[in-house]
């Protein structure tokens, strides 16, 4: 097993290009290790990931190339011959939900919460929805995006976003690693390839997601909200 922690402490687990590159590097290393069957994504307790780095987004008015790179990372999760698993102990929002949706298995503690707050900023979870719909079904993913309401762990488990609720995640991880160790990596890859053919996330899906993200990020109302947050720490619902 190879473990990577996504929470960067002071930045509360925001997703930026550096994190995306680091996750790609960890995948490269895990895939190169013939003994490794599991890439485990973890965080510091309290916050798993808050999604897009909004301060960085405020400084980047042009096309969001990072959106395409993030989409490619999620798609790689669904194709690698590794079992990609995540342990959640706390809050997950925005792109963090996308990371989970693209994982093969998600373990979460009872106190965890899961939300898509993008609409509050005038945005949409463009890169997240294709993977979340595949995992939870259309209506649950759509409702999460529309209402922006956080789900508790029990709700997330009921809709398939969480695979196991664990008071003791370490014990659940040991069980997972034990069982994954019995699988041939080629078989995991075959399963992902076949499942991907049954529910395809294509290059056209990627293009649609990135183009829509670029369109929304260029809207004046969105730029104003991001700028206000970056400059004054003011959220849209506080204005």
In which residue ranges do the predicted regions lie?
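Conserved CoA-thioester-binding segment of acyl-CoA-metabolizing enzymes
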Residues: 1-44, 178
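Glycine- (often His-adjacent) and acidic-residue-rich active-site loop
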Residues: 21, 43-76
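Alpha-helical segments flanking ligand/cofactor-binding loops in enzyme cores
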Residues: 75, 97-98, 130, 142, ...
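Glycine-rich beta-to-alpha active-site loop
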Residues: 75-121, 150
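Well-ordered beta-strand positions
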Residues: 90, 104-105, 143, 147-149, ...
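Key positions in alpha-helical "signaling/recognition" and NTPase switch elements
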Residues: 99-100, 156, 229
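C-terminal long alpha-helix characteristic of the crotonase
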Residues: 107-112, 162-208, 237-239
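Hydrophobic, secondary-structure "cap" segments at the distal end of domains
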Residues: 129-139
């Amino acid at each position: 097993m190879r473990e990577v922690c996504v929470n960067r402490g002071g930045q509360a687990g925001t997703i930026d290009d550096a994190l995306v590159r680091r996750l790609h590097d960890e995948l490269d290393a895990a895939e190169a290790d013939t003994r490794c069957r599991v890439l485990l994504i973890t965080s510091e307790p309290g916050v798993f990931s808050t999604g897009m780095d909004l301060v960085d987004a405020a400084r980047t008015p042009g096309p969001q190339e990072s959106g395409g790179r993030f989409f490619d990372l999620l798609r790689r999760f669904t194709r690698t011959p590794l079992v990609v698993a995540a342990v959640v102990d706390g809050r997950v929002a925005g792109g963090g939900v996308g990371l989970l949706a693209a994982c093969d298995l998600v373990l979460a503690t009872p106190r965890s919460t899961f939300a898509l707050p993008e609409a509050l900023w005038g945005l949409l979870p463009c890169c997240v929805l294709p993977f979340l719909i595949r995992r939870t079904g259309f209506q649950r993913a759509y409702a999460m995006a529309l209402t922006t309401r956080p789900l508790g762990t029990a709700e997330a488990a009921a809709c398939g976003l969480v695979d196991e609720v664990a008071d003791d995640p370490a014990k659940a991880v040991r069980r997972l690693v034990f069982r994954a160790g019995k699988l041939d990596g080629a078989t995991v890859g075959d399963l992902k390839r076949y499942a991907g053919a049954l529910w395809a996330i294509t290059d056209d899906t990627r293009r649609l997601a990135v183009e829509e993200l670029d369109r929304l990020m260029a809207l004046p109302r969105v730029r104003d909200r991001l700028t206000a947050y970056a400059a004054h720490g003011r959220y849209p619902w506080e204005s």
